[in-house]
Amino acid sequence: IPANNGLLLQQQEFLQFLRQQCTANGTLLIFDEVISGFRVGFEGAAGLYHISPDIITYGKIIGGGMPVGAYGASAAIMANISPEGPVYQAGTLSGNPVAMGAGIAQLTELLKPGFYEELESKTTAFVSAIQQYAESRNYQFKIFQVGSIFWFAFTGQEHIRRADEIDGDSMNVFKTFHRELLNRGVYLGPSGYEVSFVSSAHTEADMEKAKLAI
């Protein structure tokens, strides 16, 4: 799920095509789930779309707020990493206990029954209310959403799957939108290309305040 240049939701068939072509041509399929990992489900986008990548990368959420990154792959691929294999990978802060402890605590929370269902329901209710209001005013406005990730797009387009489909002029509208929300006590990322997230820490009061401000 490309989510660092807008939220570009891909079709299931396209992702399956990538998997098939990589397999047929002996190419590794890598899923970057630094943003989508653990946000759209405990198995990330790979689980959501039922696609098995050869290599997968994670970050952000797995550290519970602490800086951390991780990657995983099949046993055959991971056998290439030292000391078993020739590829050296290490770092001063690799596996540092503070980040690992925070990450374990975070993942324990995510595994609680109903966690993702409640989070997605909260996000969907928030997004739907804003979208319905925009449509009632005939605004050129669309909120793209998957799981707890959403993206405000000032466009009438129903689908945006590639970065070059984003109207760059709409970013001028976002600048005003961002400034007005700041004045009302709601902070979004400073770029119109950035996605936003709902977390379990957001209360109903938080969501209502943001909704009314928007």
Regions found by a protein language model. Give the residues of each.
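Conserved N-terminal phosphate-binding loop of PLP-dependent enzymes in the Aspartate aminotransferase
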Residues: I1-I214
